[in-house]
A protein has these predicted regions:
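Short structured motifs
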Residues: 17-21, 32, 62-66, 77-79
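Short, surface-exposed binding/anchoring microloops in extracellular/periplasmic proteins
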Residues: 6-54
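Short linear proline/tyrosine/threonine-rich motifs used for host-factor recruitment
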Residues: 56-60, 69, 93-95, 104, ...
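Solvent-exposed serine/threonine-rich low-complexity stretches and specific carbohydrate-binding patches
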Residues: 54-73, 107-111
Length: 127
């Protein structure tokens, strides 16, 4: 399928109607973002990202799930209140798209303007 199934906006720019969205809030959040599905996705996971160092290589790992949903749909955005986004990603999402493919993304922040966006990533399992 063309394009991404989810877009990310700062919560203040999303124009959410009270009660018209789902939410997951971490303790002491530093930012609120909204995931806006452009089409339905299934098996959604919001999880902790860790890392493993090996020589001069840094490998991102998928750690514990913080929030899961059977599906996300365009009529029900998801607000995430997240901790500070660090240089090395510390949170990620995954879902299964309409073609049945697993899609995984790190939640990252632009070094230029502080915009939070999704970067497609392949995570190792935590070990």
């Amino acid at each position: 399928m063309e394009g991404e199934a989810l877009s990310v906006l700062p919560a203040e720019d999303a124009g959410l109607a009270e009660g018209g969205y789902d939410a997951y809030r971490e303790a002491d959040p530093m930012a609120e973002i909204v995931l806006l599905p452009t089409r339905s996705v299934t098996d959604f996971h919001y999880f902790i990202v860790g890392f493993r160092e090996g020589g001069d290589q840094l490998t991102l790992t998928r750690e514990d799930d913080l929030y899961t949903a059977d599906a996300l749909s365009p009529d029900r955005p998801l607000l995430l209140a997240i901790p500070f986004v660090e240089t090395i990603p510390n949170r990620g999402i995954s879902y299964v798209d309409a073609d049945g493919a697993l899609r995984q993304y790190a939640i990252v922040e632009s070094g230029k303007d502080g915009t939070i966006f999704l970067m497609e990533e392949v995570f190792d399992s935590a070990a």
